[in-house]
Regions:
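A mid-to-C-terminal "edge-of-domain" accessory segment
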Residues: 23-24, 30, 265-267, 272-403
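Catalytic alpha/beta core domains of metabolic enzymes, predominantly
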Residues: 194-197, 201-322
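Active-site beta-loop-alpha junctions enriched in small/polar residues
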Residues: 32, 67-69, 92-96, 118-122, ...
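Alpha/beta enzyme core
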Residues: 42-59, 82, 97-213, 234-239
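N-terminal capping/small domains of soluble enzymes
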Residues: 4, 13-96, 345-348, 352, ...
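Hydrophobic faces of well-ordered beta-strands that scaffold small-molecule active sites
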Residues: 26-29, 62-64, 87-93, 113-117, ...
C-alpha cells in the first residue's frame, strides 16, 4: 500500500466510523410495510402527500413501495421518485432480476435512488418458503447484486428473518452482499421474536464477524409482535446499528413496525444515555404527520399511544395535576410542543383533585374570590357528578357554579 492509498484508506475508515458512531439514519417504510397493515390501501396522490410530509420531518430514506408487486405500486414509486425531493427514494425488490429491473425502472427519476434487495436467510424460510439450499441463496445474492450494481445510487440488502437465522451463515450472506456492492446491511426481526439483549448480541456478532462490514451501515427492521420493537431498535443502536427502519404510528404487518416517533423521542429524551447521537429529525412535525397518516389510512391512533396519542400529555389524577401545575417536569419528560402537540391537557374527572378544580374555575373566567367553604362545596358537587359521568365538561362546571 503506497502512502497515497494509505491516506485514502484512513479517510474511508474515518468516514464510515463517523456514519456508524455519531448519527442514526431513519428509513421510513410507511408507504411499503405500513401499507401492508390489514385494510389499508393508499392511492398514489395520498402516498405523495405522505412522502412530502416525511421530507418535512427530515427522513433520510423513504421506501416508496414494491414496484414488482402491482402496477399501482410501480406508478406510486415512479411518481414519488419524480416529484419528491430532499430524501433518498427507495424501492423494494426480491432477489431476482425481474423484480430488480422493475425497481430500477421506477427509480430512474429519483434525485437519489436506493435499491432494497431481500431474500430469506433463516433455515425455516429457506426450507419451507424458498426451497433453496444455503449455497443457492449465496449464489442468488451474488448474481442479483452483480446485475444491479451501478444502476442505482446505492444498494441495501436485507436478510429476511435474519434474527432467527444461523449467525455465521448470516455473516457469510452479508459479506457476499457487501462484496457485491451493498453499502447498507439490514437485519430484520421479521416476526418480532427477539428480546432486546439477545438482539443487541446478534448485532454485535454481525458487526464483528461479517467480512467488509466496516464499509457498510448496519440497519435494523423490528416488528412489534411482542411489544418490543422500540426496545429492540434501541438495543441494536447501542450495539452499533446506525439505520432504523420504521413507520409513522407504528403501522405494518400484524402488530406493526416500530414507530419512528418512539425511536426518535427515545434518543432525544435520553440523549444522555445514548451519548448525544445525532438525529436529524424535526420532532415538531410528529403530531401533524401522525394525524395525516391516520386520516389517509383510516387507522386510528390509540389514545394512549406514546408520543402522538391524544392522552400522551393528558393528566386526570389529582396528585399528577397538582404536580403539573407546580412544575410540568414532575410528570412530563418532554413538552407537547416538542412533538407539535398543542399543550398539556388537565382532564377533570373523578380522580381529579381540588387544586385542579380550583385552577379550572379560574380558566373558565370565575375570577371572583370564593371562600374556602364555597370552593369545598363546589368541589363536593363536582366529585359527586364525576362519579356518575365518564366525562365532565366545561358546561357541567359552569352549571355547578351558577345553580
Amino acid at each position: 500500500m503506497n502512502r497515497y492509498n494509505k491516506v485514502l484508506w484512513f479517510i474511508s475508515i474515518e468516514k464510515v466510523e463517523i456514519m456508524n458512531q455519531n448519527r442514526v439514519y431513519f428509513f421510513d417504510t410507511t408507504l411499503r410495510d405500513g401499507e401492508q397493515t390489514p385494510g389499508v390501501a393508499l392511492r398514489t396522490p395520498e402516498k405523495v402527500e405522505i412522502a412530502k410530509g416525511l421530507v418535512r420531518l427530515g427522513i433520510d430514506v423513504i421506501e416508496a413501495g414494491f414496484p414488482a408487486a402491482s402496477p399501482g405500486d410501480f406508478e406510486a414509486v415512479q411518481t414519488i421518485a419524480r416529484e419528491v425531493k430532499g430524501a433518498t427514494i427507495c424501492a423494494l425488490a426480491r432477489a431476482n432480476e425481474k423484480d430488480v429491473q422493475k425497481a430500477i425502472d421506477a427509480l430512474k427519476d429519483a434525485e437519489r435512488s436506493r435499491l432494497h434487495v431481500f431474500i430469506a436467510i433463516s433455515e425455516l424460510h429457506m426450507e419451507y418458503k424458498l426451497k433453496m439450499t444455503r449455497q443457492e441463496v449465496l449464489d442468488k445474492v451474488k448474481s442479483v447484486l452483480a446485475y444491479a450494481k451501478g444502476k442505482v445510487d446505492e444498494i441495501e440488502f436485507s436478510g429476511e428473518d435474519a434474527a432467527r437465522s444461523d449467525l455465521d451463515f448470516a455473516c457469510q450472506v452479508f459479506g457476499v452482499a457487501i462484496a457485491g456492492g451493498a453499502t447498507i446491511i439490514n437485519v430484520p426481526d421479521t416476526v418480532g421474536y427477539m428480546m432486546p439483549q439477545e438482539f443487541a448480541s446478534k448485532i454485535r456478532y454481525i458487526k464483528e464477524h461479517t467480512p467488509g462490514i466496516e464499509n457498510a451501515i448496519i440497519s435494523v427492521h423490528c416488528h412489534d409482535d411482542l411489544g418490543l420493537a422500540n426496545a429492540n431498535s434501541l438495543a441494536a443502536i447501542e450495539a452499533g446499528a446506525r439505520q432504523v427502519e420504521c413507520t409513522v404510528n407504528g403501522l405494518g404487518e400484524r402488530a406493526g413496525n416500530v414507530g419512528i416517533e418512539e425511536v426518535v423521542m427515545s434518543l432525544k429524551t435520553r440523549h444522555d444515555y445514548f451519548h448525544d447521537l445525532q438525529v436529524n429529525i424535526d420532532t415538531k412535525q410528529f403530531t401533524k404527520l401522525s394525524k395525516l397518516v391516520s386520516r389517509l389510512t383510516g387507522v386510528a391512533v390509540p389514545p394512549n399511544k406514546a408520543i402522538v396519542g391524544s392522552n400522551a400529555f393528558a393528566h386526570e389524577s389529582g396528585i399528577h395535576q397538582h404536580g403539573m401545575m407546580s412544575n410540568p417536569e414532575t410528570y412530563e419528560i418532554m413538552t407537547p410542543e416538542s412533538v407539535g402537540a398543542e399543550k398539556t391537557s388537565i382532564v377533570l374527572g373523578k380522580h381529579s383533585g381540588r387544586h385542579a378544580f380550583e385552577d379550572h374555575l379560574k380558566n373558565l373566567g370565575f375570577h371572583q374570590t370564593f371562600t374556602e367553604e364555597k370552593i369545598n362545596e363546589l368541589f363536593a358537587k363536582f366529585k359527586d357528578l364525576a362519579d356518575k359521568k365518564k366525562h365532565v365538561y366545561d358546561d357541567d362546571i359552569i352549571a355547578i357554579v351558577v345553580e
